[in-house]
């Protein structure tokens, strides 16, 4: 049975527009390549952070809603988001059935 997830991540603010699109496409691709079905992938825009993260005061928020049968896609996203210099913070939420 497919579980519903919501992922929110923040992209560093000093990124070029085309680089930002490439980051979003890359991470959407990571999810779909590992078996997830993306329902919605939307940009929330540039927002001020509640506190400073890696010397940044703001960032570009992005939200992805998806269905996944196995946690493989989520685990791979989580692993790669942690080592990406472009993503300064991310959070995965499993929605209740």
UniProtKB/Swiss-Prot annotation:
InterPro entries xrefs: Ribosomal_bS6 (IPR000529), Ribosomal_bS6_CS (IPR020815), Ribosomal_bS6_sf (IPR035980), Ribosomal_S6_plastid/chlpt (IPR020814), Transl_elong_EF1B/ribsomal_bS6 (IPR014717)
Keyword rRNA-binding among UniProt keywords: yes
One Pfam family per UniProt: Ribosomal_S6
Keyword RNA-binding: yes
Gene Ontology, cellular component aspect: cytoplasm; ribonucleoprotein complex; ribosome
PROSITE patterns with a match to the protein in the record: RIBOSOMAL_S6
Family label: Belongs to the bacterial ribosomal protein bS6 family.
Function: Binds together with bS18 to 16S ribosomal RNA.
Protein's UniProt name: Small ribosomal subunit protein bS6
Organism of origin: Listeria monocytogenes serovar 1/2a (strain ATCC BAA-679 / EGD-e)
Lineage, highest ranks first: Bacteria, Bacillati, Bacillota, Bacilli, Bacillales
């Amino acid at each position: 049975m497919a579980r519903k997830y919501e992922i929110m991540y923040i992209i560093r603010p000093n990124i070029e527009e085309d680089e930002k699109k490439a980051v979003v496409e890359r991470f959407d691709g990571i999810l779909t390549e590992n078996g997830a079905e993306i329902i919605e992938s939307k940009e929330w825009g540039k927002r001020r952070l509640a506190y400073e993260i890696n010397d940044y005061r703001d960032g570009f928020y992005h939200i992805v809603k998806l269905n996944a049968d196995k946690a493989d896609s989520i685990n791979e996203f989580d692993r790669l988001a942690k080592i990406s210099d472009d993503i300064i913070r991310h959070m995965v939420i499993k929605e209740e059935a």
